[in-house]
């Protein structure tokens, strides 16, 4: 995920044990039948430029975390624990509506897609991802604020 290639299913194993290497080699086609040459190529390309990709993505996350933090501070009826790392946050809201119902309404009425807190056995909150375009994040948060004011 850190390389913005969350759809790739890749992994490497490092060992000096030749028996382990032989066993892995025998099972590779069975275990990774859906991983193709393109996946290998993209993963290799990402690793060849890992510092540049990491810094780009880190900059996006830091900027967006600040956008989210300012929004939480400026928006009445919401609170959260500011994330130290990661790409998501649990934002708590002060409305008497189950998180699943809230999320269904948000997607229907505002086009917003959040994960209900009930998915994590935590009512009264939604999980918000912030690892994408900063302008889109700000627009989405504004729509969420509008919804909270309207309801």
Task: Show which residues each predicted segment covers.
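PLP-dependent enzyme catalytic core of the Aspartate aminotransferase-like
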Residues: 96-97, 105-114, 120-151
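Residue-level recognition of strand-loop junctions within catalytic nucleotide-signaling folds
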Residues: 16, 48, 92-94, 131-133
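A short linear hydrophobic-aromatic micro-motif
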Residues: 76-80, 112-117
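Generic structural signal for small/hydrophobic residues in well-ordered secondary structure
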Residues: 11, 43, 61, 68, ...
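Short, solvent-exposed loop/turn segments at secondary-structure junctions
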Residues: 1-2, 18-20, 85-87, 96, ...
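Conserved core segment of the aminotransferase class I/II
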Residues: 2-62, 69-71
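Conserved glycine-rich beta-strand-loop-beta hairpin in the small C-terminal domain of fold type I
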Residues: 44, 59-69, 80-93, 124
């Amino acid at each position: 995920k850190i390389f913005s290639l969350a759809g790739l299913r890749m992994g490497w194993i490092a060992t000096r044990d030749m028996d382990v290497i032989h066993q892995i080699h025998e099972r590779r086609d069975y275990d990774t039948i859906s991983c193709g040459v393109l996946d290998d190529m993209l993963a290799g390309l990402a690793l060849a430029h890992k510092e540049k990709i990491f810094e780009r993505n880190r900059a996006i996350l830091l900027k967006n975390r600040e956008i989210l933090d300012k929004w939480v501070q400026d928006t009445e009826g919401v609170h959260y624990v500011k994330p130290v790392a990661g790409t998501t946050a649990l934002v708590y809201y002060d409305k008497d509506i189950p998180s699943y119902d809230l999320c269904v309404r948000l997607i229907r009425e505002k086009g917003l897609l959040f994960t209900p807190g009930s998915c994590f056995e935590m009512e009264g909150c939604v999980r918000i991802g912030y690892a994408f375009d900063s302008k889109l994040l700000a627009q989405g948060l504004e729509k969420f604020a509008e919804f909270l004011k309207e309801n």
